Amino acid sequence: MSETQVKQKVREFYDQIGWQQVSSGLYQNARYEDLRPVSRQYIHRCHLRVNRHLAPQGDFLLDAGSGPVQYPEYLTYSQGYRYRVCADISIQALREARKRLGERGLYVVADVANLPFRQEVFDGVVSLHTLHHLPLGEQKQAYHELYRVLKGGRSLAVVNGWTDSPLMRRLSWLVRLMETIGKAVARLRGRETLPEKTVKTAETPSSSTPTGTFVEKLDAGWLRRELSDLQPQIWVWRSVSVRFLRAVIHRVLGGRLWLWLLYALEERFPHYFGEKGQYPLIVIHKPKG
């Protein structure tokens, strides 16, 4: 599948399915997130980590691949800005974003690897679960595009997903065990479990050919090697996958306590869990001048 075809499939998915509301404020794409009460506080605190790396105020915040800005925490990123510029390949995403942001948003249909903005115009840049849709070569280009439009003395924050998380690989036996137990319990209770979507990176529509073919793995080594000129820092956004949360974390098993402990460990060792966990928070600072 060509790069153009990949982008077309992504656009069609989000226009026709992913960003269609199924209830108030809830989108089809929500099935790629764990929205259960047991995980709610952990997910909430992970979302807020982005704020630590953005300038608290400015004129324009670029949200590259904004989607509909679907979670309340996402709105906090631009609270101190005059405008949030939402750039997305999906027109449906931008329609939904307008419902949330109104006049405080500006909306542009755009490819994040080829941004239609002049250099150094944004006081902050954020991109959440977007770059993994691109082939690896274009991911590198997209990082440089985000850097190009960022003002000097400011930082950009990108939440992405590794194609192969060492931590999740080590814990895969536990996930399989808990999924087996869960199916057995569901059968005993006389109900079927919903099939789980196996996701190696982040919230993404699947295709017969993995995005960018991934002859090279998207991991910390790739990032440092390909973006050495930008000097990226790797922090933790969230170390465990949606599949892990759904399989292992349950209220009756003390799920909230386990997630509290996990969050504390992530805070204590943010770079380790950023490199080894599922979802890194990649921060790049642009010097002045």
Stretch-by-stretch model annotation:
Residues 126:
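A conserved beta-strand element that flanks and buttresses the S-adenosyl-L-methionine
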Residues 205-221:
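Acceptor-substrate binding/catalytic loop of class I
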Residues 129-130:
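Short catalytic micro-motifs in class I SAM-dependent methyltransferases
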Residues 1-55, 70-74, 157-187:
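Conserved class I S-adenosyl-L-methionine
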Residues 202-205, 221, 225, 232-289:
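A C-terminal cap/extension of S-adenosyl-L-methionine-dependent methyltransferases
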